[in-house]
């Protein structure tokens, strides 16, 4: 999750809107470097980044189990369910953590949808909306110090003539449009997508 720039004290490391943000993993990675005496990096997280939810990881595992030998070799990190929710418009953006009324309503609504699938397709335990809301409150506390409007920040950086390095992962053959479909990832891996994923 962490950009490679975290090891340089003159950089600002940005988690853009295009990232599938697993907040506990991000915090664990930050702790892993600061525990080794690396200075705390300056990190900004886009308020438009969407979060990998605990149930995304479960759904990923359940689907792999269901498919058995016909699975697509998922990393079981929740990526496919994450993007499914993002494009179905039931994902959670970081900004939504800071609107309590919206958050409560959405948690209940999304749990209703997910629990139908859990019961009838996977035959697994239901998600408790109260427990999920509490988890999101914990996420909010973790991420709050880093959240900002990254697009506005980068716009000012461009005007000031700052250097911006975009960082991605994987390669062309993992791109969902130009890769070896269906053995691909769930978001574009091409350089052209970098500006979109960063908010430039």
Residue positions per predicted region:
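Non-transmembrane, aqueous-exposed alpha-helical and coiled segments at domain scale
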Residues: 1-200
